[in-house]
Swiss-Prot record:
Key word Magnesium present: yes
Subunit structure: Monomer.
GO molecular function, one term: magnesium ion binding
Protein name, as recorded: L-aminoadipate-semialdehyde dehydrogenase-phosphopantetheinyl transferase
Source organism: Rattus norvegicus (Rat)
Annotated residues for binding of CoA: 47, 86-91, 108-111, 181-185
Length: 309
């Protein structure tokens, strides 16, 4: 008797992913904008349409496209078959009934300043945050630090204030902030986490653009958390990115070791352009020209307010 051959399920090989997209320099044409919104789920399009400012709409749309690109290209799931949902805290996740070859597959996005960034791992818990160093909207830097005093420990403030010039102090402030947010996003608790429970011993104090460092240590409630690892990088002169990593079972990610590997890693961010974002896209809804009119309107508000995306 001849039995039919068994159908083989090919599991795609996946490494960690680090992507960045410059929303601030993206000036979409009507065709680009309408194609982009046709390539996301209707509920996400509706959510993006509620943003007042163009910069926020662009950043959120880029994030949705990055997630779909990730799932389509790394998990081999057709673009129009991907279903994204949100947790009770608003974190985007794959729908539970998705045929995913990686049970611990995890991704996270962040957008602030001029970039939207994404980090993904096949087997690791992951959180990402990006912060742009910029002067406070109102008041002096010392006044700003006073308002934010309870967000950092005394030791962290000592590190922040160890620099002579205020801009370098602000730089270190946002670096610490990105680290804390990456951890909070990785554990998925959202607002309400007491940030002074976290203390980061940052190293090195100076970082080169384009390199990735993994020497910074986390102290949680006074105890060093060795199962967590943090990748830090500067995409450009003003943007810090922190990626928090942890195995689901709580053990340390073996490729990230503070003691044994103090040199920059090679997992650098890949800067994507718009064509990269939509390379695998399949439009899922009819074209809606009115959505471009809405975008132009938010652009006008932005210009009247004297800001740029």
């Amino acid at each position: 008797m001849v039995f039919p051959a068994k159908r083989l399920c090919v599991v795609p090989y996946m490494e960690g992913v680090r992507w960045a997209f410059s929303c601030g320099t993206w000036l979409p044409s009507p065709a680009e904008w309408l194609l982009a919104v046709r390539s996301i789920q209707p509920e996400e399009k509706e959510r993006i349409g509620q943003f007042v400012f163009a910069r926020d709409a662009k950043a959120a749309l880029a994030g949705r496209l990055m997630i779909r690109k990730l799932v389509a290209e790394k998990l081999n799931i057709p673009w129009d078959h991907i279903r994204l949902q949100r947790t009770s805290k608003g974190k985007p996740i794959l729908a539970k009934d998705t045929l995913n070859p990686y049970p611990n597959f995890n991704f996270n996005i962040s957008h602030q300043g001029d970039y939207t960034v994404l980090a993904a791992e096949p087997e690791l818990q992951v959180g990402i945050d990006i912060m742009k160093t910029s002067f406070p909207g109102r008041g002096s830097i010392p006044e700003f630090f006073h308002i934010m005093k309870r967000k950092f420990t005394n030791k962290e403030w000592e590190t922040i204030r160890s620099f002579n010039d205020e801009w370098s102090q602000l730089d270190m402030f946002y670096r610490h902030w990105a680290l804390k947010e990456s951890f909070i996003k990785a554990i998925g608790v959202g607002l309400g986490f007491e940030m002074q429970r976290l203390e980061f011993d940052v190293s090195p104090l100076s970082m080169d653009i384009g390199q990735v460092y993994k020497e910074t240590r986390l102290i949680l409630d006074g105890e060093e958390e060795k199962e967590w690892a943090f990748e830090e990088s500067k995409i450009d002169q003003h943007h810090f990115v922190a990626v928090a990593l942890r195995k689901p079972d709580g053990s340390r990610h073996q490729n990230v070791s503070y003691q044994d590997d103090s040199k920059p890693s090679q997992r650098q961010f890949t800067i994507l352009n718009f064509n990269d974002l939509i390379a695998s896209a399949i439009p899922m809804t009819p074209e809606d020209p009115s959505f471009w009119d809405c975008f132009c309107f938010t652009e006008e508000i932005l210009i009247r307010n004297g800001s740029k995306s």
